[in-house]
Amino acid sequence: AEYNVAGIEIENSTGADMYNNIARFNTGGLLVFDLPIGNGTYGSGVRVFGNTVTENNTKNFANSSSNPGGVHIVPPGTGVIVLSTDDVEIFDNEIADHDTLAVAVTSFFIADENAAGPDYQSIIADGWLPVVRNIHVHDNAITNAGSAPNGALIQDMITLFTLTPELQWPGILYDGLGEQLANSSALLPVADAYEEGEKVCFQNNGDTLIGYPYDPATAATMSGPTLSPAVGADLLDCSQPALPAATLTFKGEQFGCGVDDTTSEHCKPAPVL
């Protein structure tokens, strides 16, 4: 996929594998979005692996949309983006040469700060949530990320990180906002506090710095979330169980990685010991 705003996108899908793709010269390389579209179809169980994601630095040329989470918000120079989707595993990808971020994981509050407000209650009742849970980003080869960050959506974050002397712009960004609010009971009854199996985790992604503007472990206040930025190589260092391969049965025949595809690197049968 080349020269698009969204290189390849998984949107409002359950049980999807995105693998063995090349995404380059787009605005954002690989997108996993769960949007509040109100049709009872919302996303989870997505694996992103074995992809080559390089130089997705094209200017965002999408028209504005009435949906605050449309692709018009994608910051140029972003490799992989997860927006308000649960249960996502991102592993064994090559992610290189992105001006803004190699990986971004965000709640929908980044797109609309009122994402748990009255206008969203019918969609929340329909099954959508603005937070991300159980995201595991691990064992990716990430190089040269964040040399020239840009994008209207995250301009405040760019200013915060680049103008704070003890911080520097990270290659991996987690907003932390939804998790902080949920852990402080500020989203009840919409979203409970995160359990261990619902945390956002980053492991073994090389020397890439990880950052967040809102520390999930910091309490929000009555007036709102607490800005508590941090950057480090070992932030959010945890792991989650591997997600199962996605399969599809069509006209009685089953398809999927490890089912009809047994030759791709990640789909080969395990050796018999």
Please identify what each model-predicted range represents.
Residues A1-A6, T14-G28, V32, Y42-N57, ...:
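Right-handed parallel beta-helix
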Residues T27-T78, T100-V132, T143-L188, T208, ...:
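Acidic/polar low-complexity surface segments
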Residues L177-L273:
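C-terminal functional modules
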